[in-house]
Amino acid sequence: LADFCHEQEGLPCWRETSVIHAPYCRISKLLSGYRRPDLTHLQPVGRGRVTSEPLEETGTFTVAGHVFRVLEGAGGHVRGEACYLCDDLALAFPGDIYVNAAGFTQAQSRFNQLAPYLMTSVNMNSPMASAERKAFVALVGRKYHILSGHGAPIWGEE
């Protein structure tokens, strides 16, 4: 939410403050037609992080009677990124903490090949990003249906 607030004020998002990441972010926004969200439709959920664990549960919210847990990452991929887990539906929305690269379309794969040339890594802290992915996989195992930020869904085992 903090990054969206910065954008509303005409300031760069956290990732764009990095000389290494700013060009890639700007190109991504141009190619995707990105528009800032209307903040009247957003609200913070839970509390901020208090531990140094790769993933930390920071709150919950309910949609149609289903409780979703909010797990915030430690900033490996990008600061403030979160996963949303619904245990009773076995649904996981990990954002970019965990992506299905094998399920990328050809266009996504070609675009992602630009990253090494435009910046050294898509992560702000690659060792922490790896720890976040490992924590996510340990948490959901093969039970959850995973709908990540990129790539095709991964359907869990029943």
Each predicted region: which residue ranges?
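Metallo-beta-lactamase
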Residues: 2-157
